[in-house]
Amino acid sequence: MSQKMTGSVKWFNETKGFGFISQDNGGQDVFVHFKSIVSEGFKTLAEGQRVSFTVEQGKKGPQAAQVTAL
């Protein structure tokens, strides 16, 4: 199981359903897709929002999974 990490949403495009998270540990920004957001109803994130997540290897590099608002 991947380690839970924390960070802040750098930006998220609701129309396209994706964005990036800045990691608290200073690592590279992580891609996030709306399907990875753990919530009910419309899945979106706000710029600057604090989140926890795991990192998985996606088709084009690191990708956030199990994204939960803090």
Swiss-Prot record:
Localisation per UniProt entry: Cytoplasm
GO cellular component annotations of the record: cytosol
Any single GO BP term: regulation of gene expression
Principal subcellular localisation of the protein: cytoplasm
Gene Ontology terms for molecular function: DNA binding; nucleic acid binding
Domain CSD: from-to ranges: 7-67
Source organism phylogeny: Bacteria, Pseudomonadati, Pseudomonadota, Gammaproteobacteria, Vibrionales
Keywords assigned by UniProt, alphabetized: Activator, Cytoplasm, DNA-binding, Transcription, Transcription regulation
Protein source organism: Vibrio cholerae serotype O1 (strain ATCC 39315 / El Tor Inaba N16961)
The protein's name: Cold shock-like protein CspA
Keyword match Cytoplasm: yes
